[in-house]
């Protein structure tokens, strides 16, 4: 299948990652995946949520937002609406869960690492790009803390990345752009670690149901895409 942007069904969009995109964050990247662009930045605080106080254990959490004109028509800021939208809550919880799955929280001490994922341009796949970029930003933050003697070792237990897969006009396609995502019959978001273990599988039938065989094909295609993302992450973290 030849797609509208010239890619084959199993190709990711072009990906560029710029580390150190923000000067003041403990770790930061700009991830560009096709026309989707997300700034991922990490801040460290010497405190933890109430439920972790005096536990000796740290925390990793995330916040997600979209700039008003990251979309074709203006998206209202959550602050203007007076509450975080349900979509933003869902996505930031997903990002937080995904990153916590690959970190030894006890190795952080009683410290919190807050990941801010701010979408500056949305062309589908913002939540998965946020996870892939957030891993690198968190890696850079941890490395800085180790270099400063604040952490005794890198606290990662695995590597994590994410990708979207859609069924578009009856075809399974990797990393859909907006036009494909908008018209997709089925949408999937896959999060996986480098032990080939899935952290999260989200699948929604928008206009068509799907079979177990189709699900297996989606997982196989998504897994192949995530291994490519691991290589891209490693080009920054393990040059």
Swiss-Prot record:
One of its GO terms (molecular function) is 3'-5'-RNA exonuclease activity. It comes from the Bacteria. Phosphorolytic 3'-5' exoribonuclease that plays an important role in tRNA 3'-end maturation. Removes nucleotide residues following the 3'-CCA terminus of tRNAs; can also add nucleotides to the ends of RNA molecules by using nucleoside diphosphates as substrates, but this may not be physiologically important. Probably plays a role in initiation of 16S rRNA degradation (leading to ribosome degradation) during starvation. This is Ribonuclease PH. Its EC number is 2.7.7.56. One of its GO terms (biological process) is rRNA processing. It is an enzyme of class 2 (transferase). Keywords: Nucleotidyltransferase, RNA-binding, rRNA processing, Transferase, tRNA processing, tRNA-binding. Phosphate binds at residues 87, 125-127. Pfam families: RNase_PH, RNase_PH_C. Belongs to the RNase PH family. Homohexameric ring arranged as a trimer of dimers. It catalyses: tRNA(n+1) + phosphate = tRNA(n) + a ribonucleoside 5'-diphosphate.
